[in-house]
């Protein structure tokens, strides 16, 4: 069964809600409560979870720590992922200082082509030249945060693929051409702002999208 992309996004939301509930000392929850907090229906919660198995007990609900653990497993957060940043300009540097990667993601490399940046200390490491990617990626780094200019994005992606990267979080406003076995997630701020402008001008569409 194919899992809709929107369902994965909602699972992430459910997980964050469960983490909040656990922090508040809540031991049990229900699809109704999760749905209310996630702004979706209880039916949608149950449907999203059903893609991956049977969770909870009818009339009893879900045990918060158990469902949290199951969602972390589904989303691949029960392990440590090695990250690198390629492109140490303003955005890359800001991401290097970001404290919220959590326990499942660890920055293990920083890369650029600018000789003035290479060798500069950053977050307990140093910026290295992208030519070293083939030596640094295998066995250590699975995911790259790509923060280079648009015109350099495809070449950087090619270098990452050749080095053995498994996934790319792409901040460049360009569609990358990569092998199907390499996962790509695009972060496009302008596209997000454009969706917001459309949603503001079309409130009925926004209400339908929110269920």
UniProtKB/Swiss-Prot annotation:
Coiled coil spans: none
DNA-binding region: 13-52
Record's GO cellular component terms: cytoplasm
Residues the entry annotates as binding NAD(+): 87-92
InterPro entries listed in its UniProt record: CoA-bd, NAD(P)-bd_dom_sf, Rex_DNA-bd_C_dom, Tscrpt_rep_Rex, WH-like_DNA-bd_sf, WH_DNA-bd_sf
Xref: Pfam families: CoA_binding (PF02629), Put_DNA-bind_N (PF06971)
Source organism superkingdom: Bacteria
Name of encoding gene: rex
PANTHER family: REDOX-SENSING TRANSCRIPTIONAL REPRESSOR REX, REDOX-SENSING TRANSCRIPTIONAL REPRESSOR REX 1
Any GO MF annotation of the entry: identical protein binding
Function recorded in the entry: Modulates transcription in response to changes in cellular NADH/NAD(+) redox state.
GO biological process, one term: response to redox state
UniProt source species: Thermus aquaticus
Protein name, UniProt field: Redox-sensing transcriptional repressor Rex
Keyword list, A-Z: Cytoplasm, DNA-binding, NAD, Repressor, Transcription, Transcription regulation
Record's signal peptide: none
Subunit structure: Homodimer.
Major location category of this protein: cytoplasm
UniProt-annotated location(s): Cytoplasm
Family: Belongs to the transcriptional regulatory Rex family.
